[in-house]
């Protein structure tokens, strides 16, 4: 059975390995540019843990997936080429990655997030077809393009269950 828990400092090396494996998977899937230069690094993981926003999906003691779940507003979402569905309070899912051991774990994580927040916003790289398919299948709506803190564009999606 899959359960969710906040990440703790002791999880940082394992989570860093999951992110490294995710970077390799993305590159092999035609998405070599979304997470570059070792991002997210172990230092990034530790920042998310310290901020109390990093979650893990686990089976027993094994971490199957990791993601940051952050209540908005997100500064990078303030300007969008397009339009959000609404201005309701929302949460953002960032840095979702799978260990690769359970198919569909990304969707399981997003559904868990939707059980906690009526409105979710997510962004992804234009080359991340896997994430785009998951978001569309779940009912997320493409809303436009946002720009990351480093200026790179991302496709923006929103799902509002209200």
Stretches found by the model and what they are:
Residues 2, 61-66, 91:
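Glycine-rich phosphate/pyrophosphate-binding loop shared by adenosine-nucleotide-utilizing enzymes
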Residues 3-17:
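A short beta-loop-alpha structural element at the N-terminal edge
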Residues 23-44:
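Conserved GNAT-fold acetyl-CoA-binding loop/helix
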Residues 56, 62-72:
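Conserved beta-strand in the GNAT
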Residues 68-101:
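Conserved acyl-donor/pantetheine-binding loop and adjacent beta-alpha core of acyl/acetyltransferases
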Residues 101-115, 133-137:
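Conserved acetyl-CoA-binding loop-helix of GNAT-fold acetyltransferases
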Residues 116-127:
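Conserved GNAT acetyl-CoA-binding A-motif
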Residues 123, 141-155:
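Conserved catalytic-core motifs of GNAT/GCN5-like acyltransferases
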């Amino acid at each position: 059975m899959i359960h969710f828990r906040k990440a703790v400092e002791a999880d940082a090396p394992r989570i860093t390995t999951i992110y490294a494996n995710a970077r390799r998977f993305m590159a092999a899937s035609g998405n070599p540019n979304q997470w570059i230069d070792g991002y997210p690094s172990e230092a990034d993981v530790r920042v998310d843990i310290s901020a109390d926003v990093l979650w893990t999906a686990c089976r027993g003691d094994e971490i199957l997936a990791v993601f940051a779940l952050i209540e908005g507003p997100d500064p990078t979402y303030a300007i969008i080429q397009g339009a959000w569905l609404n201005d309701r309070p929302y949460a953002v899912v960032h840095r979702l990655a799978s260990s690769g051991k359970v198919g569909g774990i990304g969707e399981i994580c997003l559904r868990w997030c939707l059980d906690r927040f009526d409105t979710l916003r997510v962004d992804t790289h234009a080359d991340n077809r896997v994430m785009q398919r998951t978001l569309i299948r779940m009912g997320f709506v493409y809303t436009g393009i946002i720009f990351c803190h480093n200026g790179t564009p991302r496709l923006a999606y929103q799902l509002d269950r209200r």
